[in-house]
Amino acid sequence: MTKLIEPKKYTKTLDLLRSFFLSRGFLEVHTQNRLSILAACEDPETVATYEYNGEIWPLPQTGQMWLEYELLKNPEAPGFFCVSTSYRQEPNPVEGRHEVIFPMFEFEMKGGVEELKQMEIELCEYLGIPLEQVNVKTCLLYTSDAADDA
């Protein structure tokens, strides 16, 4: 069973995420109503389906492809974000990774790895997540230079 999310915490978190990205000129995209196989870009074995209007569609796993679509269609925009519900039909879910049904906040933006890293640092600071936390410090170790050396 998927754990219930306390509404006050959910609202506060979404308000913070939305305000951060809106203040940077990002636009919100509603992806849940876009019937397409673009809603499922994960492992095909984990895609659940539903029938709608006589056709079979994947239950959404991600809005990522739609965000990329909007970014390509609107190159003048600094970026796009979405809030969606992700459905994962994982036969053996990895403990601690995510639930099989969960809310997801995603964003796509212009730029490369360095711009992304800077945006994520600013987001952590905005959310009050100390950069000294082990998980953030570990992420910062994976720079584009480190990837080139691998």
What positions do the PLM features span?
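Class II aminoacyl-tRNA synthetase-like tRNA-binding/catalytic domains
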Residues: 1-108
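Single conserved hydrophobic/aromatic residue that forms the stacking wall/gate
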Residues: 142-150
